[in-house]
Design a protein with these regions (language model features):
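Active-site-proximal loop and beta-strand segments within enzyme catalytic domains
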Residues: 23-32, 37, 42-46, 52, ...
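Bacterial peptidoglycan biogenesis and beta-lactam-recognition machinery
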Residues: 95-103, 178-187, 194-202, 226-254
């Protein structure tokens, strides 16, 4: 079902572009025109053209106050969300931290977690919270690529003292979730988020959603999700609503606040500091210094250009996908250029 550079001009006519069904039911998306949302339709069309010509975008959704205001590409097509998976896992953690099933202060050693070749005594002191914030100090090889621990000597950094983007941490956080809750990550996602939110394009088949990675490097594998842009946006909308959906708490509000608060600040000359003020618990917090409307904004982030951006000040969620992967990525600067241009379409 294709939507191409679509602004909702009215409820019955999408300029002949979209064949999107009216999914404004109990859990579906309602629509809103740019004018109703306070945005300029002409500028949004220009934004779409600019995005197409200056990024690897394949689909995106901008929702305002829970209603889709702008969409581009096939927003129903699932593809890998890469490291946005970590933010999804943090959402699943919330209820179990709240009810005491997961104790963030428990250590890797106390949980009996080890890995190929064993862990050093100092590494066993890393806590569950250290894993979520990527501050474990455990630089064991990861089963999945994309971390920044290559060349770091094991046993040299005490846990909780230094942020290093570390896929070993994130993968072990998945192991901890299953160990302490007794639930498969994908089954928990389906039961606790997909069904109550009414995600429309998720395929729960175990052939697609399964643990993956190089088991010769680590026992702790990755948990990759395949989601569409509109389903990514709905996860963001749940976060924007402080975890409440149809009157039910799916993710505790205090957990959302904790995860989206800076734990590890980014400061120059760190190149991330231009775009992010820091890292929380599996969420990236936006640098709003030059864009006050982004105060309090945060995002899930995946390789090659996958984003679930939540902008509370504007009641907006912006889901962005570059499904072309390495062949046609959207890197940080192009993405933020697009984000700033989207903000400029406000009246």
């Amino acid at each position: 079902m294709i939507i191409s550079m679509l602004c909702f001009q009215n409820r019955g006519n999408n300029n002949g572009i979209s064949t999107m069904s009216d999914d404004s039911g109990h859990n579906g998306w309602s629509r809103i025109t740019p004018a109703e949302a306070g945005y300029d339709a002409g500028k949004l069309a220009e934004f779409g053209e600019f995005s197409k010509n200056n990024s690897g975008v394949t689909s995106m959704v901008a929702a305002v106050d829970g209603k889709i205001m702008y969409a581009y590409g096939d927003i129903t097509a699932p593809s890998i969300i890469a490291s946005c998976r970590k933010s999804v896992l943090s959402m699943l953690y919330g209820k179990y931290v709240a009810d005491g099933t997961i104790n963030l202060n428990q250590t890797v050693g106390e949980l009996g977690i080890t890995d190929i070749g064993g862990l050093l005594p100092s590494e066993k002191l890393a806590t569950v919270y250290d894993l979520l914030t990527s501050r474990s100090g455990v630089y064991h090889p990861s089963a999945t690529s994309g971390g920044k621990t290559d060349g770091l000597e094991r046993g040299t950094v005490p846990h909780g003292t230094r942020y290093v983007y570390n896929n070993w941490d994130f993968n072990v956080a998945g192991t901890v979730f299953t160990m302490l809750t007794g639930k498969d990550i994908f089954k928990a996602f389906y039961e606790e988020l997909v069904l109550p939110l009414g995600l429309e394009d998720y395929d729960p088949s175990p052939e697609l959603h399964k643990l993956t990675g190089d088991a010769e490097l680590s026992n702790h594998l990755g948990y990759h999700f395949y989601l569409s842009a509109r389903d990514m946006a709905k996860l963001g909308e749940l976060m924007r609503r402080n975890g409440v959906w149809n009157g039910k708490v799916l993710v505790p509000a205090d957990w959302i606040a904790r995860c989206t608060k800076v734990v590890s600040p980014f400061v120059p000359p760190d190149p991330e500091a231009e775009f992010w003020s820091g890292y929380g618990a599996m969420w990236w917090i936006v640098n709003s210094e030059k864009h006050p409307e982004l105060k309090g904004a945060y995002s899930a982030l995946g390789s090659y250009g996958q984003y679930i951006m939540v902008i509370p000040e504007l009641k907006m969620v912006f889901a962005f996908k570059s499904a072309g992967g390495k062949a046609n990525p959207t890197k940080r600067r192009p993405f933020f250029t697009l984000l700033y241009k989207l903000l400029e379409t406000r009246k």
